[in-house]
Amino acid sequence: RRHTRSFHVTGVQTCALPISARNPGLTQDEITQNLCDYLGAEKVVWLPYGVYLDETNGHVDNFCRFVAPGTVMLTWTDDRDDPQYERSAAALEVLRSTKDARGRELEVVTIHQPGPITITQEESEGVDAVAGTLPREAGDRLAGSYVNSYIGNGVVVLPVFDDPHDEAAVATYTRLFPGRRVVPVPGREILLGGGN
């Protein structure tokens, strides 16, 4: 059994991260072929990195996602001193130089990340670590992102973090999904548990 959660699909194209730890023994070409065979994808776009400190080892849905055919949302920061900047800039370069399976240039919508979000002492003391999870120490950075939302029939459920960027994230989703109601949901507790 191979782990393949590090992909996001838009019907005719797939975006993926090259995380060899998730698929030991398979080459990038073999993973690409499997994604095409099993998902019916015509093209795979490999991104060099994911969200900084993402403990899931590279779930692309916390970093980059298709929001419409030919349109990709990407986690972004303007802070060049933030380790996320290099990761997002590298992905932006790949995405802007890539055509989709229909030969169209990708439209990339950047959405500023929250934070950085760090764990408080109180939160650290309140987390019961279980086998296979990372410890939660006060001051540790969490991999918060607005990209990892749920898009359903008539609705988009969007994690928010009581952050100055929350309002812009809601506005971006409202613009991109005019036929859906955008529902902001506090995401910090989920983030503390290793998700988003």
Show where each model-derived region lies.
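The feature marks the mature, well-folded catalytic cores of soluble enzymes
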Residues: 1, 16-196
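Single conserved hydrophobic/aromatic residue that forms the stacking wall/gate
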Residues: 2-15
